[in-house]
Design a protein with these regions (language model features):
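Surface segments flanking catalytic/ligand-binding clefts of nucleic-acid enzymes
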Residues: 1-122
Length: 122
């Protein structure tokens, strides 16, 4: 049991951890989604098509075949960009739609949530 200054905040922070996020921004995105009232996606969702692995996406709504990916700065590197596009093509061929989120989107959460709500409704 943690006690002392800051222990209450530390316990609250630990309660929010899920162990699946691969970056602080993914955690911020998951917490935003949790407060939004939108259906919660599966974190680190494995996408299969005809029984074969296609990709693992940051967040996925399988029933809507919608993936949500957080794109940090490193996704703009030439080699990573090409790999990301190959992966995007595989997801689309499997019938999935992909929405991307950047740091700029997280600074405008209302717009991001409106965009996601529309994608979930489509």
């Amino acid at each position: 049991e943690m006690t002392g200054p800051g222990s209450r905040r530390a316990r609250a922070a630990c309660a929010l951890a899920d162990g699946l996020a691969e970056s602080p921004q993914e955690t911020r995105l998951r917490l935003l989604l949790g407060r939004s009232g939108l259906p919660m996606p599966i974190a680190q969702c494995r996408v299969l098509h005809e029984g074969r692995f296609v990709a693992r996406v940051d967040f996925g709504w399988r029933d809507r075949r919608l993936a949500l990916e957080y794109d940090g700065l490193w996704h703009g590197e030439p080699g990573q960009f090409a790999r990301d596009r190959e992966r995007l093509n595989r997801l689309r061929e499997a019938g999935w739609r992909v929405a991307f989120v950047t740091a700029a989107d997280l600074r405008r959460p209302e717009l991001l949530l409106c965009r996601l709500a529309a994608a979930l409704a489509a």
